[in-house]
Each structure stands twice: as C-alpha cells, then as structure tokens.
C-alpha cells in the first residue's frame, strides 16, 4: 500500500508543477504582448480615426454661429454692444441641460 500513496503523491506533484509552469508561461506571454504593443497604442490613437461632431449629429451641423449671434444668444455680451465672447477661431460649445443632474 505504500507504493500507491507514493505514486499518487508524485502524480499530484507533477500536475502541480505543470500547472505552475503553464501559468508562468501564460503570464510571460501576456506581459510580452502588452509591453510590445504599448508604443503602438499611442501611435494608433492619433491616427485620425475620430470623426467630427458635425458628422455625428445632423442638428449640430445645421446650426450657424452667425445666425445665433445676430438674434442674441448666451454667447454674446449684451453690455458691450453685442460683441462675441468667443472668437471665430475657437470651437463652438453647445450647452444645455445636463442629463446627469436629472434626478
């Protein structure tokens, strides 16, 4: 009966060692893959895959900043004679109700 327990112990030991080696190889593979692709993440993120906001929402495309300032919007300074607060070179910021505050 002593041989049965010693053989069972050696199989369990071999299985444990094999599992540890497989986990170590998996960890090394994932680490090597992550470290080799980290410079490429920055390269691909600035490649120009983002779309302009006008293409995403057709309502924003129809808005004209000159028409909004001529009829008086929140972007004009009423005390200064209707002078635009934001210059034409700056991006347009459309404000509205914040959906995160609707409770």
Swiss-Prot record:
One of its GO terms (biological process) is root development. Residues 41-50 have a biased composition (Basic residues). Keywords: Developmental protein, Differentiation, Glycoprotein, Hydroxylation, Secreted, Signal. Glycans are attached at residue 97. GO terms for molecular function: receptor serine/threonine kinase binding. The modification Hydroxyproline is found at residue 97. Residues 66-76 have a biased composition (Polar residues). Residues 1-34 form the signal peptide. One of its GO terms (cellular component) is apoplast. Residues 37-103 are annotated as: Disordered. Belongs to the CLV3/ESR signal peptide family. This is CLAVATA3/ESR (CLE)-related protein 22. The lineage of its organism: Eukaryota, Viridiplantae, Streptophyta, Embryophyta, Tracheophyta. The gene is CLE22.
